[in-house]
C-alpha cells in the first residue's frame, strides 16, 4: 500500500547520473550567483480585479513582479510565481539610480521602473539593484495575476502564461516576498503547483540525467550544462547560469546580480553539487498505513521512543529526521545493484497496487522464479512478456522498471537475513540487542533499518542504538590524505600494537568526535604499561596460589585442617571477617568498582569503565595497597611453609594468606573487566595465572559475582581517615629523603601529632608503622604540632616530626628493631622474620 511510483523533485547527482537519498547528501558552503529577475504583468491574460484599498489597474501599467534566486539555470523551467496572502505587497517607482561612473558598470535598474515587492523587503532589494531613490505607489493584491516569462523574447517555448500561486512557504524574511516557482526543481514548488489545481503531467522536464538542457529548450540554451560532470572542473558550475543571466539582461528583465555563499547539497560520493530534478521514481509513503493500520511514520516514532539510545541525544536526532523526512525514495539509476522488481502501467501505477492480489501474486512468483534461476540479471534479461505468462494479465501497456534499490534499503534489511532468517532472533518479534555505528548513520543505516523493520513487522529491529563520533586530529580537524593528518591503522598496529588502539578507543569520549595524535597515544601507552605491569606484579605475587589458600573459598576448620591435618583449628581463619582491615577495605572497593564497571558496561560507557579501573590501579593498588603489603608478601610466613602453629605464627601467616586472597580476587576481576578492551593481554595473563584451569580462555569467563558482604561503608570511612593521615606522613618522608636525611622510609619512625581524636581512633587495631612503611610510629593527640613540624595546607590538623628509627636493621625485612627482642638463634632479624625462617626451615625438612 505504501509503495508508489511517481515523478517528484528529488535530489539528483548529474555527476553520477542517479537520484540521491537524504543519507547520501552532505552540505558544503558554495559561492553561487544571485539574481533579481522581473516578471511583466500580462494584463491581457484575464481580468485583474481591483478592490478595497489596492491600486487601480491603470496604475500598474508596466509594473513588474520581482523574484530572487540563487539558481538562475532554473529560470527556463519557471512555470509560476508564488506569493503569500499574509504579506503586504507594494508597487514602487524608481526615481534615481546610481550612475555608471559611480558603479564602474551600467546598472540594470532604470528611472521609471515600476516594481512590485514585499513592503518590508523593498529597501534591501532596491539597494541591491543600486537604486538610490524610489517612491511607493500603493499596495497591490496579486491574486489572479498572470505574468509573462522573463525569457519571453527567446522564443515560443517561453511564451506561456505564468500564474501567481498562493503558498504558505513564501516568507518575508529574505528575498523579495515572491518565489520563482519551477515545480520540476523544488519540493515546495512541486507541492504548491499540485495544491493549486495543476497536474504533474504539466510539469516541464527540461534538464536531462547529465544535467544538461534537453533539446526541447531553444537555442542558445539547448544542451548547456548546469554542472560540469567530467574533467578537471567536475562539480563546478556549467555554462547554463551565465547564459541565462545574459539573456535576462538582454531582455531587460534583470534587475540586479551578485555573488553569495550558500550551504548547498552535494553528493557524499562524488562531492559534486546536487540539484533537484523531477523524475519517475519509486517511493515508500511515510503517511499511509503499512502495518496494523498505522503509518510508517507513526510506527517509526513509536519504535524510537521504545529504543534505548547511547548517548541519549541520538533519540532526538533520529526522531527529528523521521518526523520531518518526506516519502522514502528507494530507487536509483545505476548499472549495478538489486533491481526494483516492479512493472508500471501507463498511469505510472506499480503492478502491486494496480492488479488484483491473485494476479499480482502470480506475477511476483514468476519474478522470483526468474531471479532464483539466473540471479538478479534474470530481471533485466528476461523478456517482459515471459513474466506475464500464466498470470491472466496482458503484458501490453506495462513497462519494466530498470531502477535498482537504494543501497541504504539493502543495508536496512540486515536484521532480516543476518539474524531472522538464520534463526538467531525470532522472525516476528525478535530484535538485535544493539546496533552500533557512526553519528552520520542516523540518516543512514539506523534509519533505513528502522523503517524497513517497522514497515514489515511494526517494530524496531534493535533494542539499543550506540552512536560513535569520528576520529579527528589533535586540533579537531577531520582527517584527510590531502592535509596529511591521517593515521593508518596498519602502520599504527605495527608500531604500537592493536591493544593500544583498543585502549585509546575505550578511554576516549567516543560518543563525540575523538582526537588522536602522537602525544595522546603516548598517554595511552603509559596507561597500558601501567595496567600490564600491574597484571605482571599480581602474577608474581600469586605464584603457587591455590583455592585451598584462599580465605574466601576455605571453610572454618572443625577439629583440624583437611589440607594440613597437623595444623590446629583456630576461630575466624576463613572469610572476610578473618582478614586485616586493609584487605577488607580493598574488598569493599572491589565491590564498589564491580557495581560501577557493570553499570558502565551496561550503557556502553567504556570511558567510565577505564577511568574507574585505571584510578583504582594507580591510586589504591600501586600507590597504597601494593606498597604497604610488600613487606607482608615478601617477609610473612607463607601458607605453604607454615609448620609452627603457635598463635603469633598463625597471625602472621594468616596476614600473608589474606593478602594473596585479596590479590587473587583483584586479579580475577581485573582480567575479566579488562578482557573486552585488552583481549590479547588479558588472555596472555590468564594463561599464566592461578585461574588458567577454570576455562579455555578468559573470554569464556563471566564477570565474577562480588558478594554484597564485601561492602562496608563504615570501614571505608575509617580507612579514608587513615589515608588522610598517611598522605601527610608520606609527604614528610619525601622531604627527608630529598634532603638525604634518610635513604628509605624504613629508616624513619615519625611522631604524628593529630588534633582530631577521630583520626587517631581510626588506627585502632592497626600497626601505623606498617601503614606508613616505617620502622615505627607514634600517634599523639594535641591541639597543634611543634614549631617546624611538617604539615600540608590542604590537610589541616595533622603534623609530622620525622625521627630516625632506633635499633638495628633487620637483614631480612630491612626494618629497624630493638635487638633485645630478637629470638634466640636469630639475633639480626625481627621476631616476625625469625618465625618465617623457622617455618621455611621446617618445611624444608
Predicted features along the sequence, with ranges:
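Alpha-helical recognition segments enriched in aromatics with Gly/Pro capping
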Residues: 38, 43, 156, 168, ...
